[in-house]
Regions:
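Gly/Pro-rich cap/lid or specificity-loop segments adjacent to the active site
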Residues: 33-330, 388-390, 394-520
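Secretory targeting and sorting signals
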Residues: 1-27, 79, 215
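Flexible "cap/lid" loop of the alpha/beta hydrolase fold
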Residues: 259-277, 351-353, 360-375
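Helix-loop "lid/cap" segments that line or gate small-molecule binding pockets
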Residues: 337-338, 392
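Long, low-complexity segments enriched in small/aliphatic residues
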Residues: 361-394, 398-402
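Short, solvent-exposed helix-helix connector turns and helix-capping sites enriched
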Residues: 290, 355-363, 495
Length: 520
């Protein structure tokens, strides 16, 4: 079975001949008209549709969803959107959403995206629903988690690989620079994704440019004149792109762990890998304070020690209790996902010690969590969706540029170096049915935007702190600096300081004072 081989595995679940012919999705345009106004004409039926909420159980797509969505405190709905906004009379999709009703006097809806791309907002809000329902945000807002087009319970849904193929290591590996050997492999990837996801027109519709248009439809159908929004990680990019397209429709926008708007996609890749290397070094230094650290007591030699543990898996996976085995790619996904938060370091140390002793069960569990694998062996579709969304968002590199990026990443993050030669590879989206539709740069400074709030963590490995500074500047909004070493913090119940300031902003539109700082 075909497999996209990874030159460099970096992110867990987390990225020629065209397949058929379809019209390119229209680039989004800034809308005119009064705040909250629905467009006249062909799109009016989407903006004017009535949302029918119902029990959430039928919306579950994973074992975890089945458990969470059985809670009768939540209700769910689907909202119709055009696959192609330039052809509203053509095929349609449905965006699924989950609601936690406000328990007090309601301001409106708070739309939430947890990142990814490919993350399920429904699952995220269901997980945090009890926490938010008990706090000030849950008192004043209907909290709405939505699955962006292509994700989770929304339809059509990105589907490139089966659960069985992921179990055999034949699906997307989580590689930042997938090693696609030639044009034929690129065509095979695009063809199987199109076949499983509703065809080439659907596959070309999954970009962020369409998602922000869907968000405006959601705003209107939920009855909100203006949008209140919480976006984390990739969700900050969605928020900023929405603000650029619909500045007059923004009420409040809290953006946590920001994608840097000043960097090209390649520059961001390198900044991110530099951030992971710094996180690895912080972890190694912490681990080295213990005499039984599996990477040794000299942090300077931690990269060498890690490679000595991980590289043998390139040839011989470590045994695991379920018989799947732990591969090199699995270890890298477990490692990088555990570097997202310092709270995961003890489990990472346990897993590396176990691996050094010849077993891979602990790290396999971390890998499964990162890849969205449930205890029943079913995977969510976050990996497939991330791949498809990036293909419609990011510029496509030439083989020479792709190969050079792989070399640069090895230099930026040596702990990820497999030791194998970097070979020339083609861009994984080379044969996608349409070119990317997200403008570059994707935000330049919306006109008429109300105050926004960007939260940025000083030791964030995945979205470096400087990105938050830059996004706050471009949006003309406020910055909240958080001293810590993790990715994502707003309204997660981990910092009273952060949660209080974010809640004050969302509820009362009160931004923190200049230079405001909190501790994770």
């Amino acid at each position: 079975m075909f497999r996209v081989r990874s030159t460099l595995v970096a992110l867990g679940a987390a990225s020629l001949v065209l397949i058929g012919a379809c019209a390119a999705p229209a680039p989004f345009e800034t809308r005119s008209g009064p705040p909250g106004s629905a467009p006249a004409g062909e799109l009016a039926e989407f903006y004017d549709q009535q949302v029918a909420f119902e029990p959430c159980a039928p919306y579950a797509t994973t074992a975890l969803d089945e458990k969470l969505f059985a809670d009768d405190r939540y209700d769910c709905a689907r909202v119709q959107v055009p696959l192609d906004y330039a052809d509203p009379d053509g095929p349609r999709g449905e965006v699924a959403l989950l609601r936690v009703k406000a328990r007090g006097e309601k301001i409106g809806s708070l739309l939430v995206n947890p990142g990814g791309p490919g993350g399920s907002g429904m699952n995220f809000v269901a997980l945090l629903g009890p926490l938010w329902a008990a706090g000030p945000v849950g008192e004043r807002f209907d909290v709405i988690g939505f699955d962006p087009r292509g994700v989770g319970a929304s339809t059509p849904r990105v589907d490139c690989y089966t659960d069985a193929e992921y179990e055999r290591g034949e699906g997307f590996s989580g590689a930042l620079v997938p090693d696609v050997a030639d044009e034929q492999e690129a065509r095979m990837v695009a063809q199987r994704c199109a076949e499983g996801s509703g065809g080439p027109q659907a596959l070309a519709s999954f970009g962020s440019s369409n998602v922000v248009r869907d968000m405006d439809v959601l705003r209107a159908t939920l009855g909100d004149e203006k949008l209140s929004y919480l976006g984390i990680s990739y969700g900050t990019q969605l928020g900023a792109v929405y603000a650029e397209a619909f500045p007059q429709n923004v009420r409040a926008m809290a953006l946590d762990s920001a994608i840097d708007p000043d960097l090209t996609a390649t520059e961001f890749n390198l900044a991110q890998m530099t951030g992971f290397q710094k996180a690895f070094e912080r972890y190694a230094a912490d681990c080295a304070t213990s005499a039984d650290c599996p990477l040794g007591t000299d942090p300077v030699r931690a990269t060498e020690a890690f490679q000595a543990i991980a590289r043998p898996l390139l040839e011989h996976p470590a045994p695991t209790a379920d018989g799947r085995g732990l591969t090199y790619d699995d270890v890298m996904n477990a490692m990088t996902s555990a570097l997202y938060a310092q709270s995961l370091w003890p489990k990472l140390t346990e897993g590396l010690a176990e691996l050094a002793a010849g077993r891979g069960d602990v790290l396999q569990a971390q890998r499964d969590s990162a890849f969205g694998r449930g205890p029943d062996g079913r995977y969510n579709n976050s990996g497939d969706a991330a791949y498809a969304i990036r293909c419609m968002d990011l510029p496509r590199r030439t083989p020479a540029e792709q190969t050079e990026l792989a070399r640069q990443i090895r230099a930026a993050a040596p702990f990820m170096d497999s030791g194998r030669p970097v070979r020339e590879s083609h861009h994984e989206c080379e044969a996608w049915p349409q070119p990317p539709t997200l403008p570059q740069p994707w935000v330049t400074g919306p006109v008429g935007l109300p105050p926004t709030l960007t939260v940025s963590i000083t030791g964030d490995p995945a979205t470096p702190y400087e990105g938050g500074i830059n996004l706050a500047r471009v949006l003309g909004g406020s910055l909240l600096t958080v001293e810590g070493a993790q990715h994502g913090i707003a309204l997660l119940g981990q910092s009273e300081c952060v949660d209080g300031l974010v809640a004050d902003y969302l509820i009362d539109l009160q931004t923190p004072p200049d230079g405001a700082r909190c501790t994770a």
